[in-house]
Amino acid sequence: MRRYKKYIALILTFIILVTNFTACKAADNTRGTGAENPLEAKDIPDNEAMLFVEELKIGWNLGNTFDAIDNNSLTDELEYERAWNGSYTTEEMIDAVKEAGFNTVRIPVSWHNHLTDDDYTVSEAWMDRVNEVVDWCINRDLYVILNIHHDNSTEYLYPSEEYAEQSIKYITAIWTQLAERYKEYDEHLIFEAMNEPRLVGHENEWWINPDNEDCIEAIACINRYNQVFVDLIRNSGGNNANRYLMCPGYAASSDGALNEGFKLPTDTVEHRLIVSVHAYTPYNFALEAAGTDTWSMENQSDINNMVGFMDKLYDKFITKGIPVVIGEFGARNKYNNNEARTEFAAYYVEAARARGMTCCWWDNNAFIGKGENFGLLNRVSCKWQYPEIVEAMMTHVE
């Protein structure tokens, strides 16, 4: 009897050891996220648009550059390029971006402070300078996303019925000029209709309320503006007939895209529209000044906040063959919390790629002070200030 008890004890010990080992391996594989692994690749439709977005791989924003506004002290409009970041763009910068492994450059551009008449004609000097940088990127086989950026105001672009006619006039004028200039460019150039269209100054400027009448109206207006944009580009000739186009929802937020009122435009060609989303998530870590400076893949809530919105975008769009580009993401530097930012960036990119989405880091060349310090590339030395963050993202691109 004792011998049997001894054997039974040995067997039980073995079972416990195997069970613990298996549990540990499962925890390792899910990286602190429970039974389901959020980093496991999901089923991705293989239509042309989805494959195109996969080829974009990972992007970098030339932020706080051509999007700069509100500086009346400048004597030369071209000085706007360095008004917010202190540097003019150089080919050496673009070389550094390319060599680091980025495959896409998003070039945010504000146009309203470069107009020459009441018909919204953009100055030739500004057009030429933006075009020069676009060419630098494309000549290096980089994809470029070009948009209308900080033009969100009642004078130019505002999503309400009161200002809809004015907004459509502005969108039409700007995109008519851009469509004509770039109509012979190939698919390396992507047009993005608007940047974060929203009710500027409203209590729901950044946080959409699906029950608020103003928000409901704004969503409908954004749908109209996106449709005007798509129709205009498609009818402008050349390669614009098949160009990939990005369309945002309210404030370009994931909530805006997921809102049941948001509708992608109808198009004359299949699989050429991309949903544009910005997601500094989780907000309290990535963007909020007073928030936390810690993020860890061992923290279940950190993981849930990130993959939660990605799963919803996947379910609504990706499963139906509609691609999504997260045109802005990142985590601001909070007291040199680079270890947390590196872990965050790696996980974010891997989780997005697992769902068929491409991400673009928001780099505003800001490194010091208590502001929104999203800078990665030192634009003077053309060296990466935080190479570990860049390398972490590149690990999960292919």
What residue spans do the PLM features occupy?
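Aromatic-rich peripheral "rim/lid" segments of glycoside hydrolase catalytic domains that contact
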Residues: N336-E398
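Active-site region of glycoside hydrolase catalytic domains
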Residues: E165-Q300, D311-A331, A354-M357
